[in-house]
Amino acid sequence: MAGTIVADTLTHSTAGSLTTDYVVEGTVKHRGHYNQFGVTVSSLTDSLNNSSISDNGTGDVTVNRTTAFSNTGYSSSGGTNYNGVVMFSSAGGSYTTSATQILTKTTSTLAAAENNNTSFMLSGALA
């Protein structure tokens, strides 16, 4: 059974209202979790809108989306455990709507590092 909900505005009884554009634009559209520590990454352990992941070397992966963003102005956030930092880069030298490069590094020297339990979230408008 298929259904449709049509709403232009969400209204709260005491907090006012909000147009649904904010909800649609602001939700996570691509997310994932992977472990790179001591292994070649070939898949995500959990994901949304992910078509593939490529292990480019130490602390360097590229994630590809099933459905692309409508532009390259999407937002990114990520984290990893064990004294690491997650950085987002341009896949192939320039930001693209269909892929994002993720770099994991140590917090002390910013050297490339293979960290476990790395997660990322990207939000923006889908094409």
Residue ranges and their predicted role:
Residues 3-69, 108-127:
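Extracellular receptor-binding modules and their adjoining Ser/Thr/Gly/Asp/Asn-rich linkers
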Residues 79-127:
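Extracellular jelly-roll beta-sandwich "head" domains, especially the C-terminal globular C1q domain
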Residues 68-81:
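Short, surface-exposed, low-complexity cationic segments
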Residues 2, 30-33, 87-94:
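A generic short-segment signal for beta-strand/edge and adjacent turn/coil regions
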